[in-house]
Regions:
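Macromolecular interaction modules
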Residues: 1-115
């Protein structure tokens, strides 16, 4: 049976005045801890273009090699370390998680401009 890659998308919004601190933590602490999980293929972050308060400012894409890997992440020691770091770093409520959702891969098409 072929493994189906899973994409987990997390949308976040830092509170006013905390964006630099939030990004430093996310890039230098959160992602390095999360990427240690064996079934995590990669993590990619995006920031919305321009000023748009209708949608969350940041999206993080977590790519898991399979549904089994995505399901195993929650109870894993790696996720426990992520959660502990988040709780210790953000004792105050510095950002909002707007949503957190998973999708199963259907198919990938590659264009001529691929690297």
């Amino acid at each position: 049976m072929e493994k189906t890659q899973v994409l987990q998308i997390v949308a976040t919004e830092p509170k006013p005045g905390t964006e630099a601190k939030f990004n430093k933590w996310y890039n230098e602490e959160h992602i390095p801890l999360a990427i240690k999980f064996k079934g995590m293929q990669r993590i990619t972050r995006y920031k919305i273009q321009g000023e748009n308060k209708q949608f969350p400012t940041y999206l993080a894409f977590y790519y898991f090699e399979s549904k089994e890997a995505a399901d195993a992440y929650g109870p894993s020691p790696e996720f426990a370390a992520v959660r502990k770091n988040k709780e210790e770093t953000w004792k105050d409520d510095v950002y909002d998680m707007k949503w957190n959702v998973r999708y199963d891969l259907i198919k990938t098409w590659e264009g001529k401009g691929k690297k």
